[in-house]
Amino acid sequence: MSDIDAYAQMLLLSNFLREPALRSAIQTLQLPAGSRGLDAGCGIGLHTVLLAEAVGPTGHVTGLDLSPEFLALAQEQAKTRGLTAQSAFQEGTVNNLPFDDNTFDWVWSVDTLFPTLANEPLPALKEFVRVVKPGGSVAILFWSAQKLLPGYPFLEARLDAAFAQMAPYMAGIRPELHFLCALGWLREAGLGDLSAYTFVADVHAPLSETVRQALIMTFQMFWGEARSKVTPEEWAEFERLCQPDSADFILDRSDYYAFLTYSLFRGTVA
């Protein structure tokens, strides 16, 4: 399996966990029927199709991504859901959008503007503002928290403190560039009428096989490289709880419950 295919599979699996929170976010935005929007950093189109459903048959959503391979998969998503007339996909970068001023009624972007030492969010946000009509909105969202190991809060806190789980937030980045400070970014980009919300997606036993696989993948994605950051005893406990072949595999518990959150930051173009 290629790196592209592996990452696409990860996105598909994790979507079973994320989609309820993102649907709630879309509902809160109350996107006007018939409006035209941009999904900036659309990946394989999983959110683009939800947005296209929300704006209805007279609306339209353009998905933008750097990866032509992801865009091809996004087109398949739209085709499968019968939404090809309401969606289009274009290659491009969020820092230099290939669209005219005042093209869209709104922009939506999920897990795309995480700052790094080499890339800050403001240039992309200014581009979002440029392509949105006056009175339109810009909404950016981030996976902001999760609790996946019920009954083991200290172990989960230690695992979460491992650098691999904190990525893409990196040591050396100014505190105001943490994604939970995104209202400040929106204000600096010239947006007004700012608001922020957090949405929860939760799962509980009995788990479907798809959700089990998504959680197993999430355990590995967050904590699979944390061994050097925790004690040998903590790592042994992690493996006891999070390895599917363990007699104490946590997903086999009849009382298993977990949740994740997405935080949305929204502003209006003057």
Give each language-model segment a name.
Residues 16-33, 50:
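Conserved alpha-helix/loop element of class I SAM-dependent methyltransferases that forms part
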Residues 57-58, 132-138:
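Short glycine-dipeptide loop
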Residues 180, 195-270:
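Conserved Class I S-adenosyl-L-methionine
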